[in-house]
Amino acid sequence: MNSLMSQSRRVMDKTEFLAAIKLVSGEELLSMVTSVHDENGDYLIVENPIEVEEVMLPNKQAGAKVQPWMKFSREEQFVIPKDKIITIVEVTEEVAVFYHMSLRKLNTDF
């Protein structure tokens, strides 16, 4: 367990990176994140977060549904207190490609 905590701490100490985030609400996000620790507390600044949800396709395969995390806002950055985060990991290159492709599609749809 200690190695998991130290791995999470290393990820959280990076300046800015593309992450998969699981919130206590159950939401799963992909976003560029910056970890902040200052007099206001510990929090993440998420930039262009998208919510990802697993869905079953008609052919019985799993697919992904993506949507803006904050559907009624044109803001690009949001603050999430770290106590609202279950876990956070840096994504693979394949997920990064999926994120950027999804973000481009969402930006043209809205």
What are the language-model segments listed below?
Residues 2-110:
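Conserved RNA-binding domains used in RNP assembly and mRNA/RNA metabolism
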